[in-house]
Amino acid sequence: MQKLQENDLSTSQTFKRLWPTIAPFKIGLIAAAAALVLNALTDSGLIYLLKPLLDDGFGKADTSFLKLMAVLVIVFIFIRGITSFISSYCLAWVSGKVVMTMRRRLFKHLMYMPVSFFDQNSTGRLLSRITYDSEQVANSSSNALVTIVREGAYIISLLAVMIATSWQLSVVLFIIGPVIAVLIRLVSKIFRRLSKNMQNSMGELTATAEQMLKGHKVVLSFGGQQIEEQRFNEVSNDMRRKGMKMVVADAISDPIVQIIASLALSAVLYLATIPSIMSQNLSAGSFTVVFSSMLAMLRPLKSLTNVNSQFQRGMAACQTLFDILDLDTEKDKGKYEAERVKGDVSFKDVSFTYQGKDQPALKHLSFDIPHGKTFALVGRSGSGKSTIANLVTRFYDINQGEILLDGVNVQDYTLSNLRTHCSVVSQQVHLFNDTIANNIAYAAKDKYSREQIIAAAKAAHAMEFIEPLENGLDTVIGENGASLSGGQRQRLAIARALLRDSPVLILDEATSALDTESERAIQAALEELQKDRTVLVIAHRLSTIEKADEILVIDHGEICERGSHEELLALNGAYKQLHKMQFNG
């Protein structure tokens, strides 16, 4: 059982882990980088042309050179436009591929996580990881990369132009460069921490909104609008405060860089007045090129400072995704597979405790369910009935003892094979936003014919409400069957189990959502379904399990009574008390 933890990796470590995801698309990166570098060179090239333009073109009134310059400007601008398109397209392609790959990888990983993981982590927070955090990765692999490569190449090319023109005036850059680098490194650490806080806040915001949307009827019924509004406002305000901290850090770093750069400009102007430098044939064109280059550096320096926050958001998002991907999926070490089991189920001294709980949910439980028999579990809420059903299918792994299926430990089966032998119909039915037919034949629609699906629906008395629908079995039922009643949804779940035809059937209060008339009809179908199968029934309504071969009364994780319906009534114990409560009011 795992709860999502936060690790603290450096930016380089995080990017090193992200690189294998980017590497398959590196051809796009290379093309984009080449285009960005060429784009930067055209900009710095235009500045470099100022020297001959001023010294030769205007200084010497060379009209032929001025005509050549006119052509060169057009060529440079054309190259700039082409390279801008290539870089934008290639980086959009790479970032889209990276985000898609990360989302697919995360989605697949979550599907194989144990049930205990979802007990410990909110759905809203996980949805935020799949949507918001994975999208943030695009910012680090595209927008930030555009700025880093292009502006970095631009600064380097401008520096080369300055040194080639007058290294004496350019030396001031080697003094301010390390100062700016230290500043950016300091701001990076601050942004990284603030970005992680922002991602956590987004998860909380999504979880809060999802909680209200899913429980909307409860909110309306109990007049909880003000409570939910207050809860959402608090989370929203917390996210706003954290966002403002990032803005403050960004706003402070930007003017500091600008001030340092302006000092460099002032230094260049001052150095130009020194006779020893003026005597080095410093022409008007040379000075204009150096000064213009330093002015031109202000924009890329500002961009590089600002992109740091964006890049750190992306790296922080990567880390939150890796936090999930580093968690272990369900333990599936079994090698045994059976084409079809008989269905003998045995619990041998089984004990189980939920993570974070002091008291065990089950204590030294032992019983055998022979093939073809129906065993029912009854007891008060929280006594451990549903836990027993979850252990058979290995949604949780036991702490002590063993559970056998046909004499083979369930731990020795592969998970997929074990679960093909078990059909579960629970109280909480989940249907998908798909057609009725696809929901009945979920995950195996190519395995069953249309006739088999119809037969299962008829056996579950579902065709009674399906046939009047305009599209019948091809009706799309909405998210979680929103267009159906509780009883109709339950009957589709029973039809799904009927179609699967597994030798072990687990009914976890399967008729709890049905009205009395529907329950009678379904009960007849369930009795037919239970023939030649091992059936474990968790029942709230005792009337549904009177014909069970044996009834186990569970109390505080232990079997306190067992026997047939008549035998347990004769004992005049816990079962008799439950029976009186239901039938005698």
Curated annotation (Swiss-Prot):
InterPro entries hit by this protein: AAA+_ATPase (IPR003593), ABC1_TM_dom (IPR011527), ABC1_TM_sf (IPR036640), ABC_transporter-like_ATP-bd (IPR003439), ABC_transporter-like_CS (IPR017871), ABC_transpr_lipidA (IPR011917), P-loop_NTPase (IPR027417), Type_1_exporter (IPR039421)
Origin superkingdom: Bacteria
Gene Ontology molecular function, alphabetical: ABC-type oligopeptide transporter activity; ATP binding; ATP hydrolysis activity; ATPase-coupled lipid transmembrane transporter activity
Residue stretches spanning the membrane: 18-38, 68-88, 142-162, 163-183, 255-275, 277-297
Residue stretches making up the ABC transmembrane type-1 domain: 30-313
Record bears the keyword Cell division: no
Entries under PROSITE patterns matching the protein: ABC_TM1F (PS50929), ABC_TRANSPORTER_1 (PS00211), ABC_TRANSPORTER_2 (PS50893), MSBA (PS51239)
EC number: 7.5.2.6
Gene Ontology CC, one term: plasma membrane
Ranges for domain ABC transporter: 345-581
Keyword Cytoplasm (UniProt): no
Keywords assigned: ATP-binding, Cell inner membrane, Cell membrane, Lipid transport, Membrane, Nucleotide-binding, Translocase, Transmembrane, Transmembrane helix, Transport
Annotated positions binding ATP: 379-386
Topology term for the membrane: Multi-pass membrane protein
Reaction equations catalysed: ATP + H2O + lipid A-core oligosaccharideSide 1 = ADP + phosphate + lipid A-core oligosaccharideSide 2
Broad class of where this protein is predominantly found: membrane
Annotated compartments: Cell inner membrane
Family: Belongs to the ABC transporter superfamily. Lipid exporter (TC 3.A.1.106) family.
Subunit structure: Homodimer.
NCBIfam families recorded: MsbA_lipidA (TIGR02203), PRK11176.1 (NF008381)
Domain remark from Swiss-Prot or TrEMBL: In MsbA the ATP-binding domain (NBD) and the transmembrane domain (TMD) are fused.
Primary role: Involved in lipopolysaccharide (LPS) biosynthesis. Translocates lipid A-core from the inner to the outer leaflet of the inner membrane. Transmembrane domains (TMD) form a pore in the inner membrane and the ATP-binding domain (NBD) is responsible for energy generation.
The protein, known as: ATP-dependent lipid A-core flippase
Native organism: Mannheimia succiniciproducens (strain KCTC 0769BP / MBEL55E)
